């Protein structure tokens, strides 16, 4: 644990035009802030693994992937994603809502880190 505070921001960063630079053809969707805050942040509330994945008879690597995905930052901590396993292939889908596809990408990255990319293929 490094004691870092992290947050991704999708709207308010536009208020400070000098906070970022874009080249021609680039579009900014989100900004991730990482650093040591003036006050220590608090862990976000998290859903149970069974709320975001089919957790029946699954291997340990899948469980670790889901646990890692639950640590991923999501819009308003909604965790609107769902993982399932079928014949060694992992499916991930986004729920409804603003930024849910961005949330899904971040959750999938966390899933890969927790599960070990060598253990599965994406469906």
Q: PLM ranges: what are they?
A:
Residues 1-123:
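Acidic, surface-exposed loops and disordered segments
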């Amino acid at each position: 644990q490094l004691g870092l505070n992290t947050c991704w921001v999708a709207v308010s960063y536009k208020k400070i035009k000098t906070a970022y630079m874009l080249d021609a053809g680039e579009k900014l969707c989100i900004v991730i802030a990482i650093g040591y805050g003036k006050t220590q942040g608090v862990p976000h509330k998290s859903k149970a693994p069974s709320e975001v994945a089919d957790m029946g008879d699954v291997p340990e690597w899948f469980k670790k992937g889901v646990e890692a995905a639950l640590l991923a930052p999501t819009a308003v901590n909604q965790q609107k994603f769902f993982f399932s396993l079928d014949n060694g292939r992992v499916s991930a889908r986004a729920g409804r809502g603003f930024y849910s596809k961005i949330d899904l990408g971040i959750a999938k990255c966390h899933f890969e880190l927790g599960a070990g990319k060598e253990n599965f293929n994406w469906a």
